[in-house]
Amino acid sequence: AAAGRRGGGRVSTKRAGGFTFNHGAQFLTARAPAFVSAAETAIVHAALARWHVAGRDALAGQPTMRDFPDFLQQGLAVRQQTEIATIRHDSDSICLVDKTDETVSARQVIVTAPAPQAARLLQTAAPDLAALAATASYAPCWTAMYGFDAAPPAHNPAPIGDPDGPVGWALWESDRPGGDPSNHALTVQAAPGWSIEHLEDDAADVARTLLLAWQDASGQSVGTPALTSAHRWRYARVV
């Protein structure tokens, strides 16, 4: 079950106004053997592509980040927009109760929510695990998205970012592996410190500020976006 409209959580893609933005995780890395195997299978099926970026060997969803979780959940019965309220033991099974009080029983449960949310879900069924999850600290991330009618100016296709500045990551979507050159979309993710400082700011103010910061950091000058949006990831990364 997933509370969102699509699977993948922070491995996410947004489409709006004819533009496509990979506004969550920008790439994946595979180290654990089981995940390496899954990633290799996804590469064979064109759901992932190798991407050497930001000094690391990474993986990019194809054609978007969201397509990788879509690939993984093929053949599964997935319930979207279903928020689990409680997890509890019931004789020899585990019960999941959603916000409408509908109950589903299972032999095993995997919780992939961010640790603060997982801690609340596991308080009854696995208090020790809940206590461990509660010790995790997360940094938020403001993500701003801009769609333009015109193609971007000439630029270095590498992402830009400064962990100590407002802009932690910024990239034209067309510069991603397999990126559509007609998708004149820019994604800017704020650095953790800036996101913490401005966590409760108005989304429109965040978008305006980050566009100016990106222009200063990149040296690129762009006109008024045809589309502007911002998304706040409250639990973006473990710190």
Give the location of each predicted region:
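A conserved short coil-to-beta-strand element within the FAD-binding core of flavoproteins
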Residues: 80-95
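Central helical "cap/lid" subdomain
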Residues: 8, 103-157, 220
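Flavin (FAD/FMN) cofactor-binding core of flavoprotein oxidoreductases
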Residues: 215-239
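Glycine-rich FAD pyrophosphate-binding loop
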Residues: 1-17
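Short beta-strand to alpha-helix junction loop
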Residues: 26-35, 48-73, 200-209
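Active-site substrate-recognition segment that forms the wall
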Residues: 145-199, 205-218
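A short alpha-helix-loop-beta-strand transition element characteristic
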Residues: 18-22, 34-58, 81, 130, ...
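Glycine-centered tight beta-turn/hairpin loop motif at sheet-sheet or coil-to-beta transitions
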Residues: 99-101
